[in-house]
A protein has these predicted regions:
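Short alpha-helical donor nucleotide-sugar binding micro-motif in glycosyltransferases
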Residues: 132-138
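A short alpha->beta transition loop at the rim of the catalytic pocket in nucleotide-sugar-dependent
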Residues: 139, 161
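Aromatic "clamp/platform" in nucleotide-sugar-dependent glycosyltransferases that forms part
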Residues: 145-146
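A charged, aromatic-enriched C-terminal amphipathic alpha-helix characteristic of glycosyltransferases
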Residues: 188, 201-247
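Conserved catalytic-core segment of nucleotide-activated headgroup transferases in glycan assembly
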Residues: 45-122
Length: 247
């Protein structure tokens, strides 16, 4: 709502912006018309140099990164933006109906409402190198998120050569999902989409790491960001690449 926009010296913050890097399918819904826009996220840069051990065995069919909000296991902010309610529904279908084995990171001590409890493992918080190892040891990653600008675990999973199973309604990160990386699902197509994904994995259809490294990272995304900035201000110093500072 225009009246609710933050004002600085009587003008909308947007009026001071020369260009937007965004994550949206339809940026015009969120960004003022007439401002240059580029589909670019921090996750375009954060995964290309991660250590990948291609010799690790596959121990799990899927991994889900779903940190609990508290020891009472109630849904708070993290559970909301990670979409734990849909994650649990997916896990139930994946393990109870399809017989898949999963590892749920971050929910140690919290119940998961499924019958085949022997088909899931839960962990507490794990250090980043261990998380990457678990991703590599999984056949795919479950990402049910919607309110997510561009989930880091998605591109980290791609860099670990692990395909992705992603909520079609995710706000950002959707651009990484294609016939080289994985599939989308909706709440009504979980079983069907997961079956397609597993069949494709069995037939070696996917090459997620190759896709990510060839289409994102410093050389590709850095060149695109440089060109975008130069289009806004041609007087910027010459350089080969520009990148975001990644956390």
């Amino acid at each position: 709502n225009k009246e609710q926009n933050i004002k600085v010296f009587g003008k909308d913050v947007e009026d001071y912006v020369l260009g937007w890097c965004h994550c949206f399918r339809e940026p015009e819904k969120y960004i003022k018309p007439g401002i240059p826009k580029l589909l670019m996220s921090e996750s375009d840069f954060n995964s290309e140099n991660l250590h990948y051990d291609l010799n690790l065995p596959k121990l799990y069919d899927y991994i889900a990164v779903q940190p609990k909000d508290n020891d009472e296991c109630t849904v708070g902010w993290t559970g909301y933006y990670k979409n734990w309610p849909l994650a649990e529904k997916c896990i139930k279908i994946l393990s109870d109906e399809l017989g898949l084995k999963g590892i749920i990171v971050g929910r140690d001590g919290c119940p998961v409402n499924i019958k085949n409890k022997d088909l899931i493992e839960t962990t507490g918080f794990v250090q980043h190198p261990e998380l990457l190892k678990l991703m590599t040891q999984s056949r795919f990653i479950l990402i049910p998120n919607t309110e997510e600008a561009s989930p880091r675990v998605l591109t980290e999973s791609l860099a670990m050569n692990t395909p992705v199973f992603v909520n079609k309604d995710i706000l950002g990160g959707w651009k990484y999902v294609n016939d080289k990386t994985g599939v989308f699902f909706t709440e009504s197509t979980i079983k069907e989409s997961a079956t397609t994904l597993m069949n494709n994995i069995k037939n070696n259809v996917y090459s997620p790491r190759e896709y990510y490294l060839n289409n994102h990272g410093l050389k590709t995304s850095g060149r695109d960001l440089r060109n975008f900035l130069k289009s806004i201000n041609p007087e910027l110093n010459d350089c080969e690449y520009v990148r975001f500072e990644v956390s």
